[in-house]
Curated annotation (Swiss-Prot):
Pfam (any one): Glycos_transf_4
Protein name (record): UDP-N-acetylglucosamine--dolichyl-phosphate N-acetylglucosaminephosphotransferase
Positions annotated to bind dolichyl phosphate: K156, I210, F211, C212, P213, N214, S215, I216, N217, I218
Membrane topology, as annotated: Multi-pass membrane protein
Organism: Saccharomyces cerevisiae (strain ATCC 204508 / S288c) (Baker's yeast)
Length: 448
């Protein structure tokens, strides 16, 4: 009954989108619901097939270590791409030709009263949209390759930049803006209001395409965390878009409409995946979903022209990466898996540890470890000679356990997601308040 009601709602939303405005966003909601239903239906039906072909893993944080299907993130990714292809006529509905005399002439078009010339088809927007889909397709393929062949970090770290090439090329051809604004207090010294970064701006965008997927992949290992953080990021991005729809100038609304129509269907398929991946999980998402989801946010930030704001929403992921650097760069021994340790006796998660007795850290880093311990940023274990013999692994997940003590897996995940949401809200407030003070204006308002 619920599915019949949902299908009826989808039909009404899509029909409404053809006859009323704002058509693109209304249709996006309809396709988001459709994506949720399709993903929710497919996941339980394909799980056993994934296990049969060897795509499975053991849940180390459960008694008995049950075997669960892995790489299930490929299902919502495939559904999302399929939905976004079907969505094309709806986002460009107002430009569609309904009468033509041939020879490429547009005689009569569907017209929406929005102050735009509907006879001029926005090929630049279509190329951006298609490049985004092509970029995401390439990312999904790379993610599946990683899940199948278990690529080493040094090999897969830069792969998202290769997948982002279509996106960067279309940005260069259709938009090509590489100027960044200078804070007002620096304008007097530099005698200019902006700086052209040229090629370095493309390096920055490629770096963002590398960072977003990998940052989600690093902050993982707890049931529901990979998908949960992406749902929180999607909600925060939509809140930012809503600010521009309600308060922003007309010039910025198209970019944020583009952002919203990419995010809403993504939110739909992610909610369906989260239903099966949250504690106690029945499926694993795999690296495929982490790459796919991260690239969605990179694409939205780049093509929506608010990449700096998007990076602010990734503050917990940035902190997690910086916090992990001593282990990632081998200053401190780094186990292959740094997941929190599950205690079967009480069912709680404890910080996992790196053994420093067998493989001591670099001598220059020992005082830093003790400083971090004093700041309560890590937990150290000492022997009778006051020598360090182990440290908690340096991830945001383990740090949460160091701060708040052992907790059940679902509570641990919810704590990190609440932290992500609160920091994201503060980041948005800071972006639109402090940014306006530093630069003298913001896209939402101007400071005089």
């Amino acid at each position: 009954m619920l599915r019949l009601f949902s299908l009826a709602l989808i039909t009404c939303l899509i029909y409404y989108s053809k006859n009323q405005g704002p058509s693109a966003l209304v249709a996006a909601v309809g396709f988001g619901i459709a994506g949720y239903l399709a993903t929710d239906m497919l996941i339980p039906r394909v799980g056993k097939s994934f296990i049969k072909i060897g795509l499975f893993g053991k849940d180390l944080s459960k008694p008995g270590r049950p075997v669960l299907p892995e790489t299930i993130g490929a299902i919502p990714a495939a559904v999302y791409l399929f939905v976004m292809f079907i969505y094309i006529p709806f986002i460009f509905y107002k430009y569609m030709v309904i009468t033509t005399s041939g020879g490429g002439h547009r005689d009569v078009s569907v017209v929406e009263d929005n102050g735009m010339n509907s006879n001029i088809f926005p090929h630049d927007k279509l190329s951006e949209y298609l490049s985004a889909i092509l970029c995401l397709e390439s990312t999904v393929l790379l993610g599946i390759a990683d899940d199948l062949f278990d690529l080493r970090w040094r090999h897969k770290f830069f792969l998202p930049a290769i997948a982002a090439i279509p996106l960067l090329m279309v940005y260069y051809v259709d938009f090509g803006v590489t100027h960044v604004l200078i804070p007002g207090f620096m304008e007097r010294w530099l005698k200019k209001t902006s700086v052209d970064l040229g090629l370095w701006y493309y390096v920055y965008m490629a770096s963002m395409a590398i960072f977003c997927p990998n940052s989600i992949n690093i902050l993982a290992g707890v049931n529901g965390l990979e998908v949960g953080q992406c749902i929180v990021l999607a909600i925060l991005a939509l809140l930012n878009d809503l600010l521009y729809f309600s308060m922003g100038p007309l010039a910025t609304r198209d970019s944020h409409r583009f952002s919203a129509v990419l995010i809403i269907p993504f939110l739909g398929v992610s909610l369906a995946l989260w239903k099966w991946n949250r504690w106690p999980a029945t499926v694993f998402v795999g690296d495929t979903y982490c790459y796919f989801a991260g690239m969605v946010f990179a694409v939205v930030g780049i093509l929506g022209h608010f990449s700096k704001t998007m990076l602010l929403l990734f503050i917990p992921q940035i902190v997690n990466f910086i916090y992990s650097c001593p282990q990632l760069f081998k200053l401190v021994p780094c186990p292959r898996h740094r997941l929190p340790k599950f205690n079967e006796k009480d069912g709680l998660m404890y910080p996992s540890r790196a053994n420093l007795k067998e493989e001591p850290p670099k001598s220059i880093f020992k005082p830093i470890l003790k400083l971090l311990y004093c700041l309560h940023l890590i937990d150290l274990e000492f022997d009778e000679n006051n020598e360090i013999i182990s440290t908690s692994n340096m991830t945001l997940i383990n740090l949460t356990l160091v701060w708040f003590g052992p907790m059940r897996e679902d509570k641990l995940c919810n704590t990190i997601l609440k932290l992500q949401f609160c920091i994201g809200i503060l980041a948005l407030l800071g972006r639109h308040a402090i940014g306006a003070i530093i630069f003298g204006h913001d896209n939402l308002w101007t400071v005089r």
